[in-house]
């Protein structure tokens, strides 16, 4: 089994893949989210594993838009990973980490550790990299430089770096959601037995073109009177002009034979365009 993921190695996406699939799955890194999804469509890999949402930074719009407008792959699973940011240095700098000349990482990682950096390195410049994994590799490859990197445990072990400060992120409850995509919506796969799971269904709903008054209220009512709990509703532009949006709706329930199909039929009767994006298990560490 091959799993494509947003690379490079030792990023949080790679860590999530490794935490989810632990039975000999081959991990294949891709440079971008579209390349990863395209690889699954082309059959190069069995699954595409890409980020969907971060608790602090919000949704990964590229993932959502590519699934809606370019490659409508079904969501067959979801993985939520807690995000722990650490300060790493080359082993030769372990005892002098407080005198770093520069700190490398992805822009999001640096932003998520602002308080720690302001307190301990108020005048040290930052160097932004394409990913935390790429930044860790650079630090590992340049022991002659007095530099550090913000990254995860996997980056430390992969590139033989020392963790000098753990959990330096500003907020302890930061998590990232990743979706598992496959051309085969009925594909089965084994996950780490230590993961907990719950069912989830995700829909795309586009309001009627005539934009009737109260249309969104009627959409929500179709779920409300059926006691279907929505964990998320988010709008995205349809890319057909200002003021035109579709909605991504997460339902905390397995796709059944009555309630969710009934809600979908009611929405279609209202003139909405409705698409099932996936009915799947959501896994958490």
From Swiss-Prot:
Domain ACT, first and last residues per copy: 204-281
GO terms of biological process kind: L-phenylalanine biosynthetic process
Entry keyword annotation includes NADP: no
UniProt keyword annotation of Lyase present: yes
Domain Prephenate dehydratase: start-end pairs: 2-183
Documented EC number(s): 4.2.1.51
GO molecular-function terms, A-Z: prephenate dehydratase activity
Pathway(s) of this molecule: Amino-acid biosynthesis; L-phenylalanine biosynthesis; phenylpyruvate from prephenate: step 1/1
Keywords, ordered alphabetically: Amino-acid biosynthesis, Aromatic amino acid biosynthesis, Lyase, Phenylalanine biosynthesis
Catalytic activity field: prephenate + H(+) = 3-phenylpyruvate + CO2 + H2O
InterPro entries registered for this protein in UniProt: ACT-like_dom_sf, ACT_dom, Chor_mutase/pphenate_deHydtase, Preph_deHydtase, Preph_deHydtase_CS
GO CC terms of this entry: cytoplasm
Site (Essential for activity): 176
Record's protein name: Prephenate dehydratase
Native species: Bacillus subtilis (strain 168)
Gene for this chain: pheA
């Amino acid at each position: 089994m091959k799993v494509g993921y947003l690379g490079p190695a030792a990023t949080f996406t790679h860590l999530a893949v490794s935490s989810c699939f632990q039975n000999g799955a081959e991990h294949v890194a891709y440079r971008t989210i579209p390349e990863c999804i395209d690889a699954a469509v082309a059959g190069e890999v069995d699954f595409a594993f890409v980020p969907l949402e971060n608790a602090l930074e919000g949704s990964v719009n590229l993932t959502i838009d590519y699934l809606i407008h370019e490659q409508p792959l079904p969501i067959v699973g979801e993985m939520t990973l807690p995000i722990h940011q650490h300060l790493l240095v080359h082993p030769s700098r372990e005892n002098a980490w407080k005198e770093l000349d520069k700190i490398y990482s992805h822009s999001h990682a640096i932003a998520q550790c602002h308080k720690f950096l302001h307190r301990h390195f108020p005048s040290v410049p930052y160097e932004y990299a394409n990913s935390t994994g790429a930044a860790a590799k650079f630090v590992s490859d340049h022991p002659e430089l007095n530099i550090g990197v913000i990254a995860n445990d996997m980056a430390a072990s992969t590139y033989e770096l020392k963790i000098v400060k753990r959990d330096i992120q500003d907020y302890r409850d930061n998590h990232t959601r990743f979706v598992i995509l496959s051309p085969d919506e009925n594909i089965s796969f084994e996950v780490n037995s230590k993961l907990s799971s719950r069912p989830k269904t995700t829909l795309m709903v586009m309001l009627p073109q005539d934009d009737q008054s109260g249309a969104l209220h009627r959409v929500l009512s179709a779920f409300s009177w059926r006691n279907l709990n929505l964990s998320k509703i988010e709008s995205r532009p349809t890319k057909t002009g200002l003021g035109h949006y579709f909605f991504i709706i997460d339902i905390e329930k397995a796709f059944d034979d009555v309630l969710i199909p009934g809600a979908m039929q009611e929405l279609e009767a209202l003139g909405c365009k409705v698409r099932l994006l996936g009915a799947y298990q959501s896994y958490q560490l």
